[in-house]
């Protein structure tokens, strides 16, 4: 899906008429904190309800300190790594708008609709969609491009987005997106 979106965005960039309504910007986000943890709230760090064996942010993991910017485990995997012109938003919270310049980036581009995908559905994806909705963006979650450790959490998060006629947005999938992109080209 990412490769198809990149191809379509390039095609739209070359056609001024389609540029306005096409896929204009691919933004990557990742949750991470400063090495000194000054941007980490104590309640998030301590997780009082977690079992004592739970690794917490900043502790050593198999790929460096967990959720610390600059550590190998914090980087985006090669298959999804941003290309030139695709910004990376480093976020200290679960949502992509909290303590970031995402809203300013989207507004500067005149973007009003967001296609949202990622992990985990019930935490980062869901929080981002709620934050976006509060700021007036229309969100479409690509369900098959999202994931969770728990299928029932994923399913519940999807139902919550579309409840009450789409209280936070709508849900689609990559097949429908790719078909729509093909149809409009």
Segment roles from a protein language model:
Residues 1-25:
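A short, N-terminal amphipathic alpha-helix
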Residues 29:
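SDR active-site strand-loop-helix element
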Residues 7-11, 21, 33-34, 39-185:
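Active-site-adjacent betaalpha module
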């Amino acid at each position: 899906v990412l490769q198809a979106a990149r191809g379509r965005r390039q095609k739209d960039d070359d056609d001024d008429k389609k540029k306005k309504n096409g896929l204009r910007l691919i933004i990557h986000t990742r949750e991470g904190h400063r090495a000194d943890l000054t941007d980490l709230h104590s309640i998030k760090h301590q997780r009082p309800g977690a079992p004592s064996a739970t690794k917490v942010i900043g502790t050593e993991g198999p790929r460096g300190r967990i959720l610390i910017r600059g550590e190998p485990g914090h980087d985006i995997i090669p298959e999804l790594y941003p290309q030139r012109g695709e910004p990376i938003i480093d976020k200290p919270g679960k949502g992509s708008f909290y303590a970031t310049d995402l809203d300013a980036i989207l507004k500067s581009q005149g973007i009003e609709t967001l296609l949202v995908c990622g992990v985990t559905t019930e935490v980062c994806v869901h929080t981002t969609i709620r934050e976006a909705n509060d700021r007036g963006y229309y969100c479409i979650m690509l369900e098959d491009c999202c994931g969770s450790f728990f299928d029932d959490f994923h399913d519940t998060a999807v139902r919550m987005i579309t409840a009450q006629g789409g209280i936070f947005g709508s849900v689609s999938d990559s097949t429908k997106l790719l078909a729509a992109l093909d149809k409009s080209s």
